[in-house]
Design a protein with these regions (language model features):
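Transmembrane beta-barrel architecture of outer-membrane proteins
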Residues: 26-28, 65-69, 120-124, 167-171, ...
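Solvent-exposed loop/turn segments connecting transmembrane beta-strands
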Residues: 135, 166-168, 191-202
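Predominantly the C-terminal beta-signal and adjacent terminal strand-loop region
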Residues: 199-251
Length: 251
């Protein structure tokens, strides 16, 4: 991540803060849980000399797993929303290699039974501005600062290797909600960015129901996709999420 990108993100978020301290505040919590289903997960470490292999197809497969996400935030003066998101993910892989795999400086020989872990935990701070809010449509746009704490491990054939990766990524953030009845709405929610270093997308499409004022439930499909291609690490993955969420107004 280039330093000027981080500085620009911090500056943009900082410029949004003045004037909000004395505005009306409505806080909320959002909890989501469901099932994470692996799509693809292609790995080559180091990115220029390692063996390209998949954690989800061929001799190695990755099992689906439960997941959860938590958001805590507040809306100021009706149009300004800030929130923190915790979104951990841990997937387990296993299989028998059909050829040698060079991973993170070690060689895992063909015929070895291997186990692996793919961990992708993210912590996010998001600001969104409600630029349109009518009876039928609500639209918000903003920025997210995402802290990535990720790791890939491989064990077997007398070898164990782990590659960890921590970084800060700025993302564009937006949501669109179409209220097609007084209580029902369709929600499209996303954090995403693509650059020459890689890409990241977290997109959800959900059906939302307003149970009562300050309490709403949703059922939806989420996709998390992205990765990077560098001399040190090549990794691109896609994970599907089927989940239900509950939005609660706190005060």
């Amino acid at each position: 991540m280039r330093l000027h990108q981080i500085n620009l993100l911090v500056l943009c978020l900082g410029l949004l803060a003045p004037g909000l301290a004395h505005a009306e505040v409505r806080s909320f919590a959002d909890v989501e849980s469901g099932w994470a289903i692996p799509g693809y997960n292609d790995v080559r470490i180091p990115g220029d000399t390692g063996t390209l292999f998949s954690l989800t197809s061929g001799p190695i497969s990755t099992a689906s797993a439960p997941y959860f996400r938590l958001e805590l935030g507040a809306t100021f003066a009706e149009r300004h929303t800030v929130y923190l998101t915790a979104a951990p993910l841990l997937l387990q892989a296993r299989g028998t290699l059909t050829s040698d795999v060079d991973f993170n400086g070690s060689t895992f020989p063909a015929g070895s039974f291997v186990t692996g872990q793919y961990r992708f935990d993210t912590w996010r701070f998001t600001y969104r501005y409600t630029w349109w809010n009518s009876e039928a449509l609500e639209a918000k746009v903003g920025l997210t600062a995402l802290v990535r704490d990720a790791g890939i491990t491989l064990q077997g054939g007398g070898q164990f290797e782990e590659r960890l990766n921590v970084g800060l990524v700025p993302l564009f953030s937006f949501s669109f909600r179409w209220r097609f009845s007084p209580d029902w709405s369709l929600l499209l929610d996303s954090d995403a960015l693509a650059s020459g270093f890689g890409r990241a997308e977290d997109v959800q499409l959900a059906l939302r129901y307003q149970l009562r004022p300050g309490l709403a439930a949703r059922l939806g499909y989420r996709i998390v996709e992205g990765g990077s291609d560098s001399p040190n690490v090549y990794n691109f993955s896609l994970t599907h999420f089927i989940g239900a969420g509950l939005e609660v107004g706190l005060w």
